[in-house]
Amino acid sequence: MENRVADELIHLPLPEVQAVNVINVRHGDGDGDGENGWERHLDDEQMQAMRLENPQVAMLLDAPHEPPIELHHMLEPVNVPERPRKKRSFLTISKPFHVQPERCALISNGWRAVQCVQPEKRGECFANYLIKHMNSRNYPNGEGLPKRWGQY
């Protein structure tokens, strides 16, 4: 038995292009080639036939006119280099002024004294420091002590 290639060809029924369906129109858009330029308008059947006959033309006709917009580039902020900052003299640079909380000398000294103590014993040591040092010898006539609760 011999393997023979079938002599039958597959024919797709394509609509015939008729001269009646093709319309030639002068391309007179005022750019100077109105006399020589011609446009050819094809109906849907003729366009389909042309696409089937020539796949390269079909790819060109189906291709988008512009490259696709990639949105993931627009979602990220664009890194713009910063302008070089003006060099300023250290004498003219203002620094924030930190206001010291208003405390009497006894409280400030007591707080400084308990900083080296373990955190769980600080409250007890602070109270002992206040009792030991709040006397008339350190603060004669109550000078430097708060006049009322919550003043310092």
Curated annotation (Swiss-Prot):
Keywords: Developmental protein, Differentiation, Spermatogenesis. InterPro entries: Soti. Signal peptide: none annotated. It comes from the Eukaryota. One of its GO terms (biological process) is sperm individualization. Post-meiotically transcribed gene that has a role in late spermiogenesis; required for actin cone progression during spermatid individualization. Belongs to the male-specific scotti family. This is Male-specific protein scotti. The gene is soti.
